[in-house]
Regions:
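Dinucleotide-binding Rossmann-like beta1-alpha1 core, especially the glycine-rich loop
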Residues: 1-33
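Short, surface-exposed acidic
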Residues: 50-59, 177-180, 270-277
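Mid-domain catalytic core of redox enzymes
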Residues: 129-236, 240-250, 254, 258-271, ...
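Internal hydrophobic alpha-helix adjacent to the cofactor/substrate pocket in enzyme cavities
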Residues: 327-340
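General small-molecule cofactor/ligand-binding pocket signal
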Residues: 123-125, 151, 277-280, 310
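Charged, often glycine-rich, active-site loop that binds/positions anionic groups
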Residues: 287-297
């Protein structure tokens, strides 16, 4: 469903179901106090407002696509944040979506940002893997890297995921360690596919069928000027959100490619093997911190018990969805609060 007409003609839902669903979405868009949704499971809240049939036909497939079985312990604040973002992308209610992009992608943004801060005298070092963080008697903080080099700092900001924090920061208090260790994550496997021709005219296709091995189809060329930026080719992303312990992280790239492409061709019979120019796979085990019940109350502070050490990562996004905009805003708020 991509517009109001398709929504009204959607066969699996009765007229009453559609009214309840529309009311549910509209009501969620008007809620300002998101914290009151943190103590309600998303399943319970959606069933209350949309009804069981709509939950089974609409909400459950979408929740499982995004969260897997972890939806069962996710709070209603998650769906509130999702609906808020959906409304923010529309100019006039449900009439028109407004999406934008930066020509050149995030590489252009990062290159520009890097040049600016380097001109300010900042040194950027990449491929430095931190193994150990420790504060010394002189209050300086040292970071030991995998390449056996050591950096000494007055202040240090870590942006790494929670499961790594407690491994490299032994001086944190037990309370801090427990809080970080109790954060639950979802990981992602994402295939980037370059095609000779488009799959469809839609930017995002949410998948609700259990037999499909990926959870959505994001076709960038439906949003971006493909003639100008992709040489009239089509760039498609196929993400799959899973637990960090999921067996797919041990599956070979060849097996994932075979499974994903076969499914894509089943969904789009016009797609031939010759149409597939490039197929690349990215993996990340700790991407999205699950907003479990009363999540914001259990979240560790950005300022740690170690003077000068701050931990600021995507787990601190408590009233929004995980995306670049929210991440940048989080960084700006943290910098203004502690270093402004």
């Amino acid at each position: 469903m991509s517009n109001s007409l398709e929504f009204l003609s959607f066969p699996p839902l009765s007229l009453l179901d559609k009214i309840r669903l529309g009311t549910n979405i509209f009501y969620a868009s008007k809620i300002k106090n998101w914290r009151k949704l943190e103590n309600i499971l998303v399943e319970d809240w959606l069933k209350k407002w949309s009804g069981n049939n709509t939950f089974q036909k609409i909400w459950l497939p979408l929740l499982k696509a995004k969260l897997g079985d972890a939806y069962q312990k996710t709070s209603a604040a998650f769906i509130w944040a999702t609906i808020q973002r959906m409304y923010a992308a529309r100019r006039t209610g449900l009439k028109k979506e407004m999406f934008g992009y930066v020509p050149g992608g995030y590489t252009r943004i990062l290159d520009s940002f890097s040049k600016k801060i380097e001109n300010m005298g900042v040194k950027i070092k990449t491929n430095y893997i931190a193994n150990h963080v420790e504060q010394h008697l002189n209050k300086k903080i040292s970071v030991k890297f995998q390449n056996e080099q050591t950096g000494i700092f007055d202040n240090l900001i870590l942006t790494i995921p929670a499961p790594i924090i407690t491994k490299i920061c032994p001086q944190l208090t037990e309370t801090e360690k427990n809080k970080w260790n109790n954060i639950q994550y979802l990981g992602v496997i994402c295939a980037s596919v370059l095609l000779k021709k488009p799959l469809s005219r839609y930017y995002v296709t949410n998948i609700t069928e259990d037999w499909v091995p990926f959870t959505g189809i994001i076709e960038m060329s439906a949003l971006v000027d493909k003639g100008k930026y992709f040489n009239n080719k089509s760039l498609v992303y196929l993400p799959k959100y899973v637990s960090p312990q999921d067996a797919i992280f041990k599956t070979s790239d060849d097996d994932i490619r075979h499974n994903f492409i076969n499914t894509l061709q089943r969904m789009h019979p016009h797609l031939n093997s010759d149409d597939i120019m490039t197929f690349k796979i990215s993996r990340a085990k700790h991407v999205f911190a699950l907003p479990t019940l009363n999540y914001s109350e259990k979240l560790p502070s950005m300022k740690t018990s170690i003077p000068g050490l701050f931990i600021i990562n995507a787990a601190h996004i408590v009233n929004g969805t995980l995306n670049v905009n929210e991440t940048i805003q989080l960084a700006e708020r943290a910098i203004n609060k502690y270093f402004g």
